Amino acid sequence: MELRSELPSVPGAATAAATATGPPVASVASVAAAAAAAASLPVSVAGGLLRAPPLLLRAAEKYPRTPKCARCRNHGVVSALKGHKRYCRWKDCLCAKCTLIAERQRVMAAQVALRRQQAQEENEARELQLLYGTAEGLALAAANGIIPPRPAYEVFGSVCATDGGGPGAGAPAGSAGGAGGAEAKLQKFDLFPKTLLQAGRPDSPQPPPGKPLSPDGADSGPRTSSPEVRPGSGSENGDGESFSGSPLARASKEAGGSCPGSAGAGGGGEEDSPGSSSPLGSESGSEADKEEAEAAPTPGLGGGPGPRQRTPLDILTRVFPGHRRGVLELVLQGCGGDVVQAIEQVLNHHRGGLAAGLGPAAPLEKAAVSAAVEDAWPGRVEAAAAGGAGLPAPLQTGPTAPPHHRPLLAGAMTPGALGSLSSRSAFSPLQPNASHFGADAGAYPLGAPLGLSPLRLAYSAAAAHSRGLAFMAPYSTAGLVPTLGFRPPMDYAFSDLMRDRSAAAAAAVHKEPGYGGGLYGPMVNGTPEKQ
């Protein structure tokens, strides 16, 4: 525009100059000369030089380029895209160029939708962080299905670094179980229980759930065996009675038997004990269980410095602290090193002394031993002290067992103490050696292969699963468990009260095998128990 206005001005200026300088007569000649000079000049070059700036200025001055329809452009038509998509003539064209354009548009639309979704999720995650704090916001975002932010937008790295955990588990663990500094920085609510989050942390100590761990750490024996043994009968899935001397038991312990080492703990199976005594309606047994549960956290429960290295003589001195060590050693030698038989002999000696006229007032060691037997059969030891006169003591209301002797029992029932008494698990078959258990000829016919001494039965039950089942021997009637090695009901003073007879009374009725020349021979007199 300016160029067109400038180009005609050159001859006009020449004519004006000519008219001003030259005479009016020669004006036509001067105009012709000026036109010839202008024609002889390189006008094309001057025009190109003069046209370039107006073109650039025109591009800068105009509005930005509007989007055009690609389909129309493929077919040689230029049309603005605004409001044109519906009315395009080639909107349904299937040529190669239009198909390529349609595919490109579909890919671009998918990318735009993905970026829009990611931006929305990041905004939601930031809102949750502002509301609940960093760690809880991430947890809620994961719970709601919101994708966590990408590493380029990671804002949790500093929190995870302070907590010392990974990005996956460190953030939830740091929210509830982390350091106090991180909790002070983050204003958050307790949306997750702290115990569960502490359990996920590897450095968090897990307290025992009410049960003290055994010294060897294998406390899973009574937990796994007691619930399975409880529903069955005592004669089918009881503990093996193979107390064939302490060397064999020690060898089995060194071989890695976890059940004998862990089942003898005083608190190892206390939670299972009410289930073993309550189904047959023993009130005194449940009361004794409650007393033992209260007296469970005693110093005797903690494992000694070397419970596995305790000798049979040490076991006897723990069970009978009132006896001299030399006397207990002689009794152990007379029994051939069998700890259970030695304990039976000492108990028979005390039982004989009670029958001779000592009465219910038992000395301190007798009370301790009675507490030891009562731990296997709760509330049934008083029958031995009663001597068969009148009703047995378990029928009287109220607990009569001295609970203050339980620490001694807990010390005596440590895994090391009972580890040498039992070398079988709760699922091993019973020992078919009847003479080894001292079953007499008057036992049941089926009890010959399963002849069990009551005290041995009690200690076997305590060694197997710490009074988990105890074979239900104190509660058995004549028709309930006929395979146990007890005398028929007519030998007892109260045949109609067979459910309440105790192991001590059953052991006092029939004579145990004696050892001639020993200090503690068979001194049991069966007449006080007879009517």
UniProtKB/Swiss-Prot annotation:
InterPro entries: DM_DNA-bd, DM_DNA-bd_sf, DMA, DMRT, DMRT5_1_DMB_dom, UBA-like_sf. The keyword Zinc-finger does not apply. Keywords: DNA-binding, Metal-binding, Nucleus, Zinc. It is found in: Nucleus. It comes from the Eukaryota. Residues 69-116 bind DNA. The keyword Metal-binding applies. This is Doublesex- and mab-3-related transcription factor A2. It comes from Mus musculus. The lineage of its organism: Eukaryota, Metazoa, Chordata, Craniata, Vertebrata. The gene is Dmrta2.
